[in-house]
Amino acid sequence: MTRVVHIIGAAFLLSSYAYCGLSRFNEHDIEGGDSYKRVKREFERLGSKWLGGTINYYYADNNNSVKEKVKSAIAYIANHTCIKFNEDPTHWQRLKIFTSELSHCRSTIGAPGTRSGSAGELSMETGWCANIGSIVHEFSHSLGRYHEHTRPDRDNSLKVTSTDYEARPRPWGMTTMYGPFEHGSIMMYHSSNYGVGKMEPYDMEYKNTMGSRRVTFYDMYKINQYYGCGCSTQLECKNGGYTSPSDCSRCNCPKGFFGKLCNERRQQDSYELKATYGRWQTQTISFNYKPEPVSDGFYSTFVYITGEANSTIEITMEGLENVICTAGCTWNGVEIKSREDSRITSPVMCCKDEPLYKKVFKSLHNPTIIELYSKETAPSTATFKYRFMNDKIVFG
């Protein structure tokens, strides 16, 4: 559990375009020790936040199909953060949103009228944004967030040999940390974005996870932390959730957990399986996209596998049908939530020729959750085996 939103700290960077555990570090966890206090103050002084946490915006054109995706992205962010959206073309601090197919998919970083520029208007282009998640990505830039792969600590997780200007890491003095590095973040590019072999994860199980456009739990958490979102009364949220600043009567829940306190299952597309000791059982689950009132453009089916107390749950994939193999697994895929922090994205698979396929995943989470996600309406299937053992494991 840690703290990271890549937010601006220097004017010469702020005007550039960008394309597409909930405890925090203490000051001694970051290089410089006591100097971190100074760095954080400097960041807050030079930062480029939307005042009052409100994005004032208007549309430059009228591509209705793209506007619907923009509206869905707005609804998703507003539902998970304290950020407000106000359609007002005359506000002194405003965002001009282009939806024409002639526009790109990019945004200036940070709010207008602050350190990102003296003008009261900046722009965001959405015409080429393929899905809702891509537009959430661009709004995140406007809210002040850099790409995940440019974090100053990225070299602990990525081997980047690209000399591309946009691939360079941001220095410590220009960021402040609000969460863990996440390969599956919506702000991460796929591994071949700068060329084959130019940006590889040290943990190669994450290669196809990079470039996802599913919004993660930590993606929204980091925005909440940067903007100081919170509630005067904290709920007793379960399973790593926290009181939602958009509605203080409920919790923001990690994926797979539902209800006011994150201690419930969803009533539909939810499967409970009980593992047996030492003996593999086989299960096939069908999954496909279904519309929801608030969505990042994907729909997930969840499988909950339980074993005896203090046991190790083991899972291995046996088959994937109608699952599209692509960088970032951006159409559909399978995530077995086996990593130590169950709120962070575990490695995602969508290809039969990758190392994850047929690997035996070992997890101490009881239950261990399998998330089967899709933005395709045609059904896909995943076949897997599961059991529990009593051996000890090291997370990973």
Curated annotation (Swiss-Prot):
Span of domain EGF-like: 224-263
EC number: 3.4.24.-
Main location: secreted
Name of the protein in question: Zinc metalloproteinase nas-24
Signal peptide: 1-20
Co-factor requirement: Zn(2+)
GO molecular function: metalloendopeptidase activity; zinc ion binding
A GO cellular component entry from the record: extracellular region
Keyword field contains Cell wall biogenesis/degradation: no
Domain Peptidase M12A: 44-230
Comment on bound cofactor: Binds 1 zinc ion per subunit.
Function of the molecule: Metalloprotease.
Active site: E138
Major enzyme class: hydrolase
Gene giving rise to this polypeptide: nas-24
